[in-house]
Amino acid sequence: MKKATKLLSVLLCVVLITSLFSACSPNGKAIMSDTYANYDNLAKTSVTIKPDGKEISSFKLSGKAEENNYVTVDLGKKTDFNTVVLKENGKKVTLFEIYASNDKDENYTFLYQSDCIEGGHTCYVGDVSYRYLRIFVNEASGKFKLYDIGVYNIKSEKAKNLRVNSYLIVNDISEKTDFSMLDALTDIILFGTAKFDAKGNIIFVDGDGNQIDEKVYADKIAILKNATKGKEINLICDIAMPYGNDNADIISMLSEENVDNTVKNIKAFVDKYDFDGFDMDYEFPNSKNEWKLFNAFLRKIDNALGDKILSLAVAPWDLQFDEDVIKIIDRAEVMLYDMFTAHGYHSIFPVTVNGINKMLQGGFDSKQLDLGVPFYSRPTNKLAYWGNYNQYDGKLDKYTNLIYFNDFDHDGNPMTAPQYINSYQMISDKTAFAVDANLGGIMIWHMTCDLPYDNELSLFRAINETKNLKQK
């Protein structure tokens, strides 16, 4: 959660190592099958036509890395749809496109482009009506095989209730902050500046970790409250954790000696600033003892907060929440980024949905989950660099996730590898999946990384436009 602050660079290295390990896990096949089994597949009786004109009854598209191969899918009649789901055996495809037409052999219109498919990729194309789909694999890292296609027209009355929840770094708030996206948000989690000490007291620090007066924090919160006045947006505070020394200070603040003081201070802080809830970003409990202390703390803070929102930033691995504790967590902000593929891509679609599946297997209900998306880039060589999406203005388009950008990483090393972002289309796909999978919402790290909302490539705009189009 702390990609933009130098203060926490050491922690990020730990997160990265853990994420690299996580990325070796299954790639989303199970949850994609479970999710879309609930909807009518409009391609279930389709015919697949090879480039030579031969027709086959089952969908298949295979080839070699150096080939640009395609098949045509005949739905049998002109069909209204908004979603195409493709599945691959393996992890080889790195670029594919979808075209559509109502004529078998001509007048094909470009619909869609993305990169990785793996266990399944939701391709959200908006409201369209066509008979023929032409699927191209443009690039792959080896022999590839696509084995399944689903075509759906999914609308939901529940789409309007999808949470759009963004972290906002308090230090970024000023009179010049861009708040043009506020109408697209339902929740804001205010991260940092306020920080715990080893006894659970709350102190205030600047971006370099130097202690400052609370008035700095209060003034920034006042700016945000003025901007959100009259809007139905929950404001939730996240008080930074005292990382370092194997979490010694965290263990101290959650210990039997200090936990009641920690809870008391959180409750007083939430009440003082009239926040709608409290979020905790604990990355990560490293022992059974830490998990025991964490579970005990969560019971206490839930009781103290009453009807206020209890939110947690959670990574989808090594979940050791007690069963009763899972039930009292209102929102799990699932961190689904900095998880790299063999190609060096972070936060690709299939790895993201696989993380959601792990949360469900870990005992969470789908409505508790906010699917985390990054509004920042990572270099494909995995160096320590996190670049804001908006810094690539002028290099962006709707579909491309790889950006060529020369700079120095946060350790001063020159960068030549491409930057991997989540494009407008990728964010749209993940939003559509969140609706289709009946998730609680979308979570963004972090708010000031985006372009202004009136920019056609704004990622907040991608979320909101998809959310609106998915409504019945």
Language model features with spans:
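Glycan-binding loop/region signatures in secreted carbohydrate-active enzymes
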Residues: 368-433, 453, 459-472
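Active-site groove signature of glycoside hydrolases
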Residues: 263-291, 335-338, 443
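Substrate-binding surface in catalytic domains of secreted glycosidases
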Residues: 165-166, 198-216, 284-396
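Aromatic, loop-rich ligand-recognition surfaces of beta-strand-rich domains
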Residues: 26, 55-108, 117-158, 331
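Conserved, mostly hydrophobic/aromatic
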Residues: 188, 280, 332, 371, ...
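An active-site-proximal structural segment forming one wall of the substrate-binding cleft
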Residues: 255-278, 297-300, 304, 315-325
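Sec-dependent signal peptide cleavage junction
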Residues: 18-30
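Glycan-recognition patch characteristic of GH18 chitinases/ENGases
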Residues: 156-265
